[in-house]
């Protein structure tokens, strides 16, 4: 039994809708052949090229290749997304940062100059609203980049910063000491990602206070935030983020990255409470992804539905109605690769590079991918399409799942199917908050209903 706050509500504007995830550097280049704003960035003009994967001279992977995707490019493709039935775009980080993934934030208050400007972001939000589309941002608040105005190990931002100046106002955000690799506490030992203390008052105020990071971007037009590694943020910090989000509007959305059942998680020496009404609106639904992909690959229907029902039974109804359901993300293999290709099984990037399923295996995989998305679009929660899945892009994990969108792709057979599924969600009330009722889950068959207040949808 999950006991949650009696007044727990989640945004009505999310329920029954469709999300689309974009990795900003790899979607569309609105301003072509732009100069690199920093000398240590490598521009990739060939949009069909594979992302860099070979280690550099010191054996590392710096994520320094940029394909030039930008905010203007996303704005140009709003009609395309609207045709796909997209209601919300979830963007991987857009704040200034010195890697193509931008999870090593350098400046929380400014768009990365390769993506555009703060004004470009506001223009994107305004243009998206005309299509009924909202923009959800990725907030990385458990760590910053070492190459940032806050830490500044590399010296890019002058003489200040916590690493270089013991009197820096940012010094108290971090832990320093000889017991740490590199002399400071970092995220999973990556020295380019110094961890912050989320209980430090000045940091909390910077992120969640009036005029802070959350407030600034929501007022610039964002529809909400996804919290990176929510498991590693204290519940009290998440609650303050929620307060900052809802202070702007109860309809602003707060999503968390959690890979398992979010109601049974333990951390910080206690059971986590972030999904019980005072923290997150909902979470990324990895258990559904695993169950659906395993089912279309041959896993018994009974086992897949048991895993799905477990989440439905554990999650508070307001959170279940807004859970983000997906088959691919920037952190996982693309769905078609999972369905149709060999598992990597620990094999390295050299083996993964250039792999592409073709022929009968591809055609069979495409049929199974279509079925998987039909399930994802009709289960409780909100479906999220990872950019490129609609044209059957392939790829193992980072960086192969982050190739540039193939705008000249011949494969277009999934697009109308996904658009029809989106239209179904928009026109059938049962897909907003309808109860999941299982009629049969055996012999490779899933047969269920979504039972709404006035309509019932039946799916086989």
Predicted region positions:
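Aromatic/acidic polysaccharide-binding cleft in carbohydrate-active enzymes
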Residues: 25, 267-269, 273-275, 281-282, ...
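Carbohydrate-binding surface patches
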Residues: 439-460
């Amino acid at each position: 039994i999950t006991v949650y706050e009696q007044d727990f509500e989640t945004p009505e504007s999310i329920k029954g809708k469709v999300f689309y995830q974009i990795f900003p550097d790899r979607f569309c280049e609105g301003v072509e052949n732009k100069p690199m704003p920093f000398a240590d960035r490598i521009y990739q003009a060939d949009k069909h090229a594979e992302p860099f994967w070979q280690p550099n001279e010191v054996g590392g992977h710096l994520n320094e290749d940029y394909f030039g995707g930008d905010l203007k490019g996303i704005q140009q493709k709003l009609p395309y997304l609207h045709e796909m039935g997209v209601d919300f775009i979830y963007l991987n980080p857009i704040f200034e940062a010195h890697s193509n993934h931008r999870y090593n934030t350098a400046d929380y208050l400014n768009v990365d100059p390769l993506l555009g400007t703060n004004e470009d972001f506001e223009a994107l939000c305004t243009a998206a609203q005309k299509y009924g589309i909202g923009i959800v941002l990725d907030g990385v608040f458990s760590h910053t980049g070492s190459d940032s105005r806050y830490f500044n190990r590399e010296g890019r931002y002058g003489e200040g910063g916590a690493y270089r100046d013991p009197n820096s106002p940012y010094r108290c955000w971090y832990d320093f000491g000889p017991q740490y690799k590199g002399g400071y506490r970092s995220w999973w030992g990556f020295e380019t990602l110094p961890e912050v203390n989320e209980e430090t008052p000045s940091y909390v105020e910077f992120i969640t206070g009036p005029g802070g990071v959350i407030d600034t971007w929501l007022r610039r037009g964002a529809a909400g935030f996804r919290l990176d590694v929510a498991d590693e943020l204290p519940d009290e910090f998440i609650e303050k983020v929620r307060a900052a989000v809802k202070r702007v509007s109860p309809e602003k959305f707060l999503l968390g990255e959690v890979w398992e059942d979010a109601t049974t998680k333990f951390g910080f020496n206690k059971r986590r409470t972030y999904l019980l009404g005072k923290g997150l609106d909902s979470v990324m639904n990895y258990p559904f992804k695993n169950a659906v992909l395993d089912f279309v690959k041959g896993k018994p229907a009974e086992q897949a539905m048991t895993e799905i029902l477990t989440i439905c039974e554990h999650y508070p109804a307001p959170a279940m109605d807004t859970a983000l359901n997906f088959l691919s993300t920037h952190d996982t293999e693309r769905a078609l690769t999972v369905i149709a290709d060999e598992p990597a099984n620990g094999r390295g990037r050299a083996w993964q590079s250039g792999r592409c399923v073709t022929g009968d295996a591809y055609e069979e995989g495409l049929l199974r991918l279509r079925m998987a998305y039909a399930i994802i679009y009709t289960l409780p929660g909100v479906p999220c399409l990872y950019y490129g899945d609609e044209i059957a892009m392939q790829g193992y994990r980072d960086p192969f799942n982050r190739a540039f969108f193939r705008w000249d792709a011949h494969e277009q057979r999934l697009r109308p199917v996904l658009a029809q599924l989106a239209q179904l969600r928009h026109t059938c009330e049962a897909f907003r908050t309808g109860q999941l009722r299982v009629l049969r889950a055996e012999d490779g068959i899933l047969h269920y209903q979504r039972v709404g207040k006035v309509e019932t949808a039946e799916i086989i």
